[in-house]
């Protein structure tokens, strides 16, 4: 077997206290999923068991939730955007989301509205999709360096898309400024003082994928011992972990939060025990994770309940893309993009590492481990996907 060393810095969470949040409980997840189930085309995304790979890596099971199959959008993010917009409109028009369908919501809107957000690609596409479904407008801002394919995907949903010359976090501030000037509704997946309601709804919407996964694991007769969750601002990681620890308890679930080393604000916050922002270009292939300022709502859950934080180089994500796209043995093939594949990439990087055994022990990975991984996106940038998987971009160095 080849042996090579990729950067995977691991920090134990010294500030873990196991305090869960009622905002991200099982009941909140059920409410969100009940709404999503009323949207035409809803079906749970696959939970793929990579049994041959699990055997190779020395664990009992590897389960990958494949979010490339979500509503034809190639990513999970619409779960948050659509749910938040629905909640916003229900509040505005005094409607009950528990009894309302997406179609009824569309008919209830008595005015033309514009929803604005900042995105690296997937969240903005989800907001644009929801706005289009409801007959409303969307203006989507993207940071510099955004792939044209991701821009086109948003434009194809009828939204306006503006690529700035700023990084993600500065683009969020610009979006807020423009929205205030024009009277738009901001649907952003990060929070700040005075802006928490919509990000909370977004995070609750993300819990639908976790609720599906728990149901699917129960049908398989397995209970997860580990979950690897990638983080940008930490909205998905916080929302999903908040739900999972309500189901399994924080003490019984070994949760690992993974980030690119060029945008590892959650990792650095985890080391300090308080929010640490990261500035600059944050140049990483994991575009969906290139965020330097943690969502305070997500951070609180991660600080309280995450077991460990990992900061890793881009080659870890690229390795995950190649492993998922070229399955071992009889395992199913999964097309996973840069931000989607990094969790599996960590498992692969550990397997090939010269200090494999000590890393396995550090992460409590053994023959009894049942590991849940979320592939949050498919090949949302096909050109770059092929450069990585076909042409060996960001290859490992032996």
What are these regions (language model features)?
Residues 1-398:
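PLP-dependent amino-acid enzyme catalytic core
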């Amino acid at each position: 077997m080849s042996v090579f060393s990729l950067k995977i810095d691991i920090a134990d969470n010294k500030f873990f206290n196991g305090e869960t949040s009622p905002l991200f409980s099982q009941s909140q997840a059920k409410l969100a999923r009940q709404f999503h189930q009323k949207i035409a085309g809803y079906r749970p995304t696959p939970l793929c068991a990579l049994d041959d790979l699990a055997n190779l890596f020395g664990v009992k099971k590897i389960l990958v939730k494949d979010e490339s199959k979500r509503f034809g959008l190639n990513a999970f993010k619409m779960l948050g955007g659509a749910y938040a917009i629905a909640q916003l409109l229900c509040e505005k028009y005094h409607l009950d989301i528990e009894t309302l369908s997406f179609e009824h919501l569309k008919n209830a809107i008595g005015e033309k509205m514009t929803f604005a957000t900042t995105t690296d690609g997937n969240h903005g596409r989800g907001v644009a999709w929801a706005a289009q479904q409801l007959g409303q407008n969307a203006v989507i801002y993207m940071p510099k360096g955004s792939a044209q394919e991701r821009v086109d995907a948003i434009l194809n949903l009828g939204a306006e898309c503006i690529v700035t010359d700023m990084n993600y976090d500065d683009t969020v501030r610009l979006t807020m400024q423009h929205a205030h000037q024009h009277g738009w509704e901001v649907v952003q997946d990060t929070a700040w003082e005075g802006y928490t309601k919509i990000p909370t709804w977004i995070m609750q919407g993300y819990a639908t994928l976790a609720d599906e996964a728990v149901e699917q694991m129960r049908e398989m007769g397995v209970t997860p011992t580990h979950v690897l969750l990638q983080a940008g601002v930490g909205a998905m990681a916080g929302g999903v972990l908040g739900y999972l620890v309500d189901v399994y308890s924080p003490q019984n679930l070994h949760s690992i939060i993974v980030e690119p080393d060029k945008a590892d604000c959650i990792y650095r916050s985890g080391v300090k025990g308080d929010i640490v922002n990261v500035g600059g270009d944050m140049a990483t292939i994991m575009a969906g994770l290139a965020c330097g300022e943690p969502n305070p709502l997500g951070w609180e859950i991660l600080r309280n309940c995450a077991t460990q934080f990992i900061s890793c180089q881009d080659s870890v994500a690229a390795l995950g893309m190649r492993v998922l796209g070229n399955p071992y043995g009889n395992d199913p093939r999964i097309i996973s993009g840069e931000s989607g594949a990094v969790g599996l990439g960590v498992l692969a990087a550990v397997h090939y590492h010269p200090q494999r055994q000590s890393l396995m022990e550090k992460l409590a990975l053994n023959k009894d481990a049942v590991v849940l991984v979320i592939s949050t996106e498919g090949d949302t940038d096909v050109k770059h996907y092929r450069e990585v998987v076909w042409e060996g971009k960001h290859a490992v160095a032996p």
